[in-house]
């Protein structure tokens, strides 16, 4: 089964997450099919902390992919932010 989840990167005490579409049997930071965005929880004020390709997330969910709970929350928040800005 394909899932969209966060793969951790960055260094110690400074996490950075890539939002990836991957097979559920792969390791958290292992092989993935496609990178659909990123999340930086410790971003400074001037830099971008979240970017998601909503059309690619929509494509994967239409193809049967499941969203992890954390990614589901981020997608919901990001789509609300994008629609408010438009």
Curated annotation (Swiss-Prot):
This is Small ribosomal subunit protein bS16. One of its GO terms (biological process) is translation. InterPro entries: Ribosomal_bS16, Ribosomal_bS16_dom_sf. Belongs to the bacterial ribosomal protein bS16 family. It comes from Bordetella petrii (strain ATCC BAA-461 / DSM 12804 / CCUG 43448). One of its GO terms (molecular function) is structural constituent of ribosome. The lineage of its organism: Bacteria, Pseudomonadati, Pseudomonadota, Betaproteobacteria, Burkholderiales. Keywords: Ribonucleoprotein, Ribosomal protein. GO terms for cellular component: cytoplasm; small ribosomal subunit. It holds the Pfam family Ribosomal_S16. Disulfide bonds: none annotated.
